[in-house]
């Protein structure tokens, strides 16, 4: 959710205990679990949630509105429909709030990312918050959306201002929405408005200088929930149904499955002996806290015995390697390919900021979802592998062609060795999954790279893009760019934030 919601929520959590207030539905010694859904597993909730403190229901905002439909995954959950009004009762768990529906009067846990404060901009379908211009264009150009599809986002360069992005046939036009000193907003000074609501309403009725009238708020993707359910981390194997094998690698298999008969998931099964269960548990505890829109969300684990199961969100497009080499991505053009690389850089920039190292960044470890969404998978697992064929750089399983020389030869894995691997990943993307250093063995590759050899420019690769790759392959790790830099330069590869904003009445161009 946007920052508005998070600030309000923080304030609400600091409210004094209102457990006996008339605004609170829960009463002492009353179980909050009024729902009882058949065929849905309980996840060890034998007690009501702790409601002392924090409680909502005082002078702060307690009424939120649902942004998406949600179907209960466990018996303690609350199902709701988009637009439904909910009273938030408890936010002690940041990911799963306890709420009451003002329509059904039922209570239960809800994913906090599915709701926003009532009458806030975050609750509007057309408000996209911190989405950048390039991301706005990608969303608005999804196939099938009509002209006039629009969104409002925060301005990237002017704090307090906004941008209106509108689809116009095969292009997107952007308008600056400036803030008045009196608190209102305007695109042109001849038509000021008290709020963004009034601005949207006006330009929905009449183009009044825009390329066209506003017709449809840009569709939003459902966010990933913070975990699969409240307190569901170490889950019973019996709660998983493995339906279809998606692939098999050196260390196990990946399956499409269903958890608890309610939720589609992906399940990675690790071959016995691949890694220590105890070490994995420690690492998984860190991994589950790493959350970003371009990281695959770790939902749950089964580590009571081998094989270890890793349960994650399901990505319909499979691995980026397969997607580009033999899937729907074989005909993708350069702008989409560069956008995919930018998404990976975004996820890695988050890991960089957290001081976390991937160690095995490659197209096979990037997963693809709807609308070309890319997410980094398997971050951190490489460090735990106990197979000599993998851990020794001359081993048959070691990914020499993706690994920086200082990491391959001296085991010096850093975020800068990940940057080197990202350059190889960029080459994979441009060549639609071609194996790096074609025609060279692993031994030849490491020997030649040490001498200064770098892959030559690939067919169809623009020179500026190749120059970015060369920066990532700098022999000195400290002279390689950061992922934050790579994200920015790739996101802006085709777009300059200083150009392309329009004034009302400007001729189409």
UniProtKB/Swiss-Prot annotation:
UniProt-recorded Gene Ontology molecular function terms: ATP binding; non-membrane spanning protein tyrosine kinase activity
Residue ranges of every copy of the Protein kinase domain listed in the record: 240-495
EC class: transferase
Limits of the SH3 domain: 59-120
Entries under CDD domains matching the protein: PTKc_Src_like, SH2_Src_family, SH3_Src_like
UniProt cross-references to SMART domains, sorted A to Z: SH2, SH3, TyrKc
InterPro entries documented for this protein: Kinase-like_dom_sf, Non-receptor_tyrosine_kinases, Prot_kinase_dom, Protein_kinase_ATP_BS, Ser-Thr/Tyr_kinase_cat_dom, SH2, SH2_dom_sf, SH3-like_dom_sf
PANTHER family per the UniProt record, alphabetical: TYROSINE-PROTEIN KINASE
Protein name: Tyrosine-protein kinase STK
Organism: Hydra vulgaris (Hydra)
Gene coding for it: STK
């Amino acid at each position: 959710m946007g920052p508005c919601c998070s600030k309000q929520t923080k304030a609400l959590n600091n409210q004094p205990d209102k457990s006996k207030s008339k605004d609170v539905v829960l009463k002492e010694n009353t179980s909050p679990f009024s729902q009882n859904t058949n065929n849905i597993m309980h996840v060890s909730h034998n007690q009501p949630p702790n409601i002392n403190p924090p409680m909502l229901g005082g002078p702060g905002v307690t009424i939120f509105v649902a942004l998406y439909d949600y179907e209960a995954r466990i018996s303690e959950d609350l199902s709701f429909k988009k637009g439904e009004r909910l009273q938030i009762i408890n936010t002690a768990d940041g990911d799963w709030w306890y709420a009451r529906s003002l329509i059904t009067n039922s209570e239960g846990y809800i994913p906090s990312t599915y709701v926003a404060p009532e009458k806030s901009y975050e609750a509007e379908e057309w408000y996209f918050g911190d989405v950048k211009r390039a991301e706005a264009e990608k969303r608005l150009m999804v196939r099938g959306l009509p002209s006039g599809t629009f969104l409002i986002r925060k301005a990237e360069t002017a704090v307090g201002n906004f941008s209106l992005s509108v689809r116009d046939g095969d292009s997107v036009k952007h308008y600056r929405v400036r803030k008045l000193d009196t608190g209102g907003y305007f695109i042109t000074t001849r038509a000021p408005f008290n709020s963004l609501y009034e601005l949207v309403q006006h330009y929905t009725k009449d183009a009044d200088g825009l390329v066209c009238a506003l017709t449809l708020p840009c569709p939003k993707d459902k966010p990933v929930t913070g975990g699969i359910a409240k307190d569901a981390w170490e889950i019973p194997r019996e709660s998983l149904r493995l339906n279809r094998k998606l692939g098999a690698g050196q260390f196990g298999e990946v399956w499409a499955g269903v958890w608890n008969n309610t939720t589609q998931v992906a399940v990675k099964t690790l071959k016995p002996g691949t890694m220590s269960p105890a070490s994995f548990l420690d690492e998984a505890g860190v991994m589950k806290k790493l959350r970003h829109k371009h990281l695959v969300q770790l939902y749950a684990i089964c580590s009571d015995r081998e094989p270890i199961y890793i349960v994650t969100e399901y990505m319909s497009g499979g691995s980026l390697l397969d997607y580009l080499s033999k899937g729907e991505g074989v005909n993708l053009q350069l702008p989409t390919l560069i956008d995919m690389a930018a998404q990976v850089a975004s996820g890695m920039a988050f890991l960089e900021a957290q001081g976390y190292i991937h160690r095995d960044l490659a197209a096979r470890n990037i997963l693809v979802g709807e609308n070309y969404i890319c997410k980094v998978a398997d971050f951190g697992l490489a460090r735990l592998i106990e197979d000599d064929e993998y851990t020794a750089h001359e081993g048959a399983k070691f990914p020499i062609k993706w690994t920086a020389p200082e990491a391959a030869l001296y085991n010096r894995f850093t975020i800068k060795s990940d940057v080197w691997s990202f350059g190889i990943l960029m080459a994979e993307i441009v060549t639609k999954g071609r194996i790096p250093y074609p025609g060279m063995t692993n031994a030849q590759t490491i020997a030649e790279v040490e001498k200064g050899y770098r892959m030559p420019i690939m067919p169809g690769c623009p020179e500026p893009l190749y120059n970015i790759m060369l920066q990532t392959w700098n022999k000195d790790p400290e002279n390689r760019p950061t992922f934050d830099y790579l994200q920015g330069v790739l996101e802006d590869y085709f777009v300059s934030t200083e150009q392309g904003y329009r004034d009302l009445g400007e001729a189409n161009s």
